[in-house]
């Protein structure tokens, strides 16, 4: 229950920050795998809503991987600006904010399947999930087959996971992974909503996606 005092009411109000401070130098303290896992979330912003940013990431892959300070500043600042704009426009996640979940429904299923262990870090799951989302989009005729191929290559160039079979150890089959996906919060009335794309930088909310199509792209990723 929210306290009645005016001071307490002020505390509970939503207020977007007027300033975000990021100490980029801390990124240089991370182990390589942790750094690259974080990059999965950066690449997501280009994939969901900014084609030019994704092109910039491709062109600057080596600088980013080498942790060039100017490249890191650009990547982090642009990601923060994109997230801020999306959250401000949709604070209660009624629409556009859901785009931030690109790759995450696949990721959450893989995290559950791997026991939330070191076998797959969250950002690695986001990268794999983003590839799967574009694979599914291509399979549904929403985007070209070149898009998921291009995204896979970019993650490979960055030294990152880009398919389910990159994950060590035994994994459940496609039926079980889809079952895990249906435990996600984005299931509404028993129907799975996913973030898909009509091209790089053109993500949208797809409702009631056919589970059989999802199984197909998962099976392909397991077999690669």
Predicted regions: what they are:
Residues 13-14, 21-22, 101, 197:
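Short beta-strand segments
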Residues 40, 142-224:
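C-terminal charged capping/lid subdomain of soluble metabolic enzymes
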Residues 16-69, 73, 77:
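Core active-site phosphate/anionic-ligand binding loop and the adjoining beta-turn-alpha structural block
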Residues 55-174:
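Active-site segments that bind and position negatively charged phosphate/pyrophosphate groups
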Residues 9, 18-20, 125-126, 193:
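Structural motif
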Residues 10-14, 91-92, 187-188:
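Solvent-exposed alpha-helices and their adjacent loops that cap or buttress functional pockets
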Residues 1-8, 12:
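Single conserved hydrophobic/aromatic residue that forms the stacking wall/gate
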């Amino acid at each position: 229950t929210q306290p009645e005092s005016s001071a307490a009411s002020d505390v509970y109000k939503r207020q977007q920050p007027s300033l975000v401070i990021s100490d980029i130098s801390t990124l240089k303290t991370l182990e390589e795998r942790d750094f690259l896992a974080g990059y999965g979330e950066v690449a997501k912003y280009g994939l969901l809503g900014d084609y030019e940013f994704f092109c910039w990431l491709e062109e600057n892959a080596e600088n980013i991987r080498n942790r060039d300070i100017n490249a890191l500043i650009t990547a982090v600042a642009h990601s923060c600006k994109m997230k801020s704009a999306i959250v401000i426009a949709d604070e209660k996640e009624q629409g556009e904010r859901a785009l931030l979940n690109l790759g995450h429904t696949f990721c959450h299923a893989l995290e559950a399947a791997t026991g939330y262990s070191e076998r797959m870090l969250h950002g690695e799951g986001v990268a794999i999930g983003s590839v799967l989302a574009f694979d599914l989009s291509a399979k549904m005729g929403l985007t070209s087959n070149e898009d998921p191929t291009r995204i896979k290559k970019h993650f490979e160039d960055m030294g990152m996971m880009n398919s389910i079979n990159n994950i060590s150890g035994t994994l459940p089959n496609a039926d079980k992974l889809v079952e895990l996906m249906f435990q996600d919060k984005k299931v509404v009335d028993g129907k799975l909503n996913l973030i898909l794309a009509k091209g790089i930088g053109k993500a949208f909310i797809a409702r009631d996606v056919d589970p059989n199509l999802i199984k197909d792209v998962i099976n392909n990723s397991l077999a690669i």
